[in-house]
């Protein structure tokens, strides 16, 4: 009877693994690699939400990673004939595009260390913004490096299963959530796929929520300093992981 119970439990565990879509990854090394990638992507999602709020508070309701909103406001001010009000949005959009361009150049230059190279460059850009605020340059110019950093971040391809995660396109995350729920209900995808989408969105909103609470009471320079410290720690962790898991790049 005990032997029968053991086989039943083993069968149930295997079925749960298949249901969640983890069967192909059920080795300690691969599972840890996947978990590390998800954690990194969640951190980057929270970071983009956090930095977006800094832009909303710091430069008059302008987004630093949400270019759809900036493009809409650019068009609105152009239609109203308010060209001076439209100009900062144009600068932000151009900075985001330049960030994507820079990210692709970095990827081409360091194909074997993409994550590390992109994160290091992103940290340097945030440091530039930190120093500009420190030098009392507190207008739109001090936030442009942050927008470049957000465009840069979107060139990272953190692949988990069939998803590329860790970007700042949260409209895309919500779209993916809807389609993945449909696919899971049709049994074409595991339920782990929409759960991951939901988790990424919740973490991004949480990052923005945290910045919204802290920003009124803590100077932007201090918040960026904390972001820099955390990013440096993440870079150190990635270097350590690269030694243990060569495919974590």
Where in this protein do the model-derived segments appear?
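Hydrophobic core of transmembrane alpha-helices in multi-pass small-molecule transporters
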Residues: 46, 139-165
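Hydrophobic/small/kink-forming positions within alpha-helical transmembrane segments
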Residues: 97, 101, 201, 205-206
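Cytoplasmic membrane-interface "Motif A"-like loop-to-helix N-cap segments
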Residues: 108-121, 220-221
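Helix-to-loop junctions at the C-terminal end of transmembrane segments
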Residues: 101-111, 215
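Perimembrane loop-to-helix junctions flanking transmembrane segments
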Residues: 65-83
